[in-house]
């Protein structure tokens, strides 16, 4: 079994969608996933996708600012790092961009969204 918290390991996948209920229906019926909703306070609801008891990904309503940029719904990977802030600095020093600065989410960890010099977007996370 892979240690998802190990530096450099893909650790999470997250769907940003314009239709949470439609996506829920699609993925539960196609893949047999179950879902569990959790409140994010002012940010709305976050849906966890599960296979049995194992959490395999998450889903949330696409933020308005992302939708206004014309982005289609998409899956985004998260890669585990030992230090989010140091990794963000390294991304910038190597020609990448920070799209969402480091932030903390209680019970989740510290994370940021970055873009490599070629334009590929991914999240980095230090799990709680």
Name the predicted role of every residue range:
Residues 19-21, 50-55, 77-118:
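Vicinal oxygen chelate
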Residues 23-25, 59, 69, 87-89, ...:
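Short acidic, gly/pro-rich beta-turn/loop elements at beta-sheet edges
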Residues 12, 45-46, 76, 111, ...:
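Conserved beta-strand and immediately adjacent loop positions that scaffold enzyme active sites
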Residues 2, 33-37, 66, 89, ...:
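Intrinsically disordered, low-complexity segments enriched in polar/charged residues with Gly/Pro
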Residues 11, 36, 57, 75, ...:
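A short, local hydrophobic-aromatic micro-motif
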Residues 7, 14-54, 93:
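Core segments of cupin and vicinal oxygen chelate
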Residues 1-24, 74-77, 125-128:
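N-terminal beta-strand motif that seeds the catalytic metal site of vicinal oxygen chelate
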Residues 33-72, 121-126:
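Conserved short beta-strand elements that form part of the metal-binding/catalytic scaffold
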């Amino acid at each position: 079994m892979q240690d998802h918290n190990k530096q450099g390991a893909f650790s999470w996948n997250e769907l940003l969608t314009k239709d949470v209920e439609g996506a829920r229906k699609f993925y539960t019926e196609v893949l047999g996933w179950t879902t569990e909703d959790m409140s994010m306070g002012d940010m709305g609801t976050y849906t966890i996708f599960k296979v049995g008891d194992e959490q395999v990904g998450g889903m949330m309503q696409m933020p308005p600012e992302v939708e206004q940029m014309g982005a289609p719904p998409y899956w985004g990977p998260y890669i585990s790092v030992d230090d989010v802030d140091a990794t963000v600095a390294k991304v910038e020093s190597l020609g990448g961009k920070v799209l969402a600065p480091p932030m903390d989410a209680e019970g989740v960890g510290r994370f940021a969204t970055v873009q490599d010099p070629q334009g590929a977007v991914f999240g980095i996370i230090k799990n709680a």
